[in-house]
């Protein structure tokens, strides 16, 4: 009798469509704010980052909460954001916020070690920037999900592709 193993994947991904919507929303809010009229303050987005630009450093500090609120309203976990230093030079200020995705090797090793230490009948294997957990029983997999959720990692994790 061949038993098919149950499995799921652990990933850290962003919904880029929702990130773009949140940036658009934050720009609309900026344009309607009296204190930002004529400041050239703007949020711009590329594949892996969001850029904040304004005339003054204090404006960047005021823009960040607007962006965070727009992202949070769209279900984007703020742990995915890695804000850089604010750069100020001759009449302008910029900040780049990196959008972090994928589970890096260091965290993947921590999670696979945690699964091993749990003494459950499950295996964890690193697959690029995600982790696959396999086991015979669904409840063992659910116990592993709970175990991982109980840790506090500094990136958001999603549990996807559940098969049993």
Identify the role of each PLM range.
Residues 1-4:
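Short, Lys/Arg-enriched N-terminal segments with co-localized hydrophobic residues
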Residues 55-60, 102, 137-140:
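Helix N-cap motif at beta-to-alpha junctions
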Residues 59-100:
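Helix-adjacent hinge/juxtasegments
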Residues 37-43, 77-84, 122-124:
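Short beta-strand elements
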Residues 36-66:
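N-terminal, charged amphipathic alpha-helical interaction modules
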Residues 18-35, 67-68, 104-116:
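Short amphipathic alpha-helix segments
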Residues 44, 94-98, 105-164:
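Positively charged, low-complexity, intrinsically disordered RNA-binding extensions
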Residues 6-13, 49-54, 90-99:
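Short, hydrophobic beta-strand segments
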């Amino acid at each position: 009798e061949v038993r098919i193993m149950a499995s799921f994947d652990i990933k850290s991904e962003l919904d880029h469509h929702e990130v773009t919507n949140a940036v658009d929303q934050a720009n609309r809010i900026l344009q309607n704010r009296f204190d930002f009229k004529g400041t050239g303050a703007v949020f711009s987005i590329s594949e892996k980052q969001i850029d904040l630009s304004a005339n003054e450093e204090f404006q960047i500090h005021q823009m960040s909460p607007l962006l965070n609120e727009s992202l949070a309203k769209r279900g984007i976990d703020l742990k995915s954001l890695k804000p850089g230093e604010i750069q100020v030079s001759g009449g302008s200020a910029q900040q780049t916020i990196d959008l972090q995705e994928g589970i890096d090797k260091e965290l993947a090793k921590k999670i696979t070690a945690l699964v091993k230490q749990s003494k459950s009948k499950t295996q964890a294997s690193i697959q690029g920037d995600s982790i696959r957990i396999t086991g015979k029983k669904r409840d063992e997999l659910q116990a592993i999900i709970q175990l991982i959720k109980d840790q506090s990692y500094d990136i958001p994790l999603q549990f996807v592709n559940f098969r049993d």
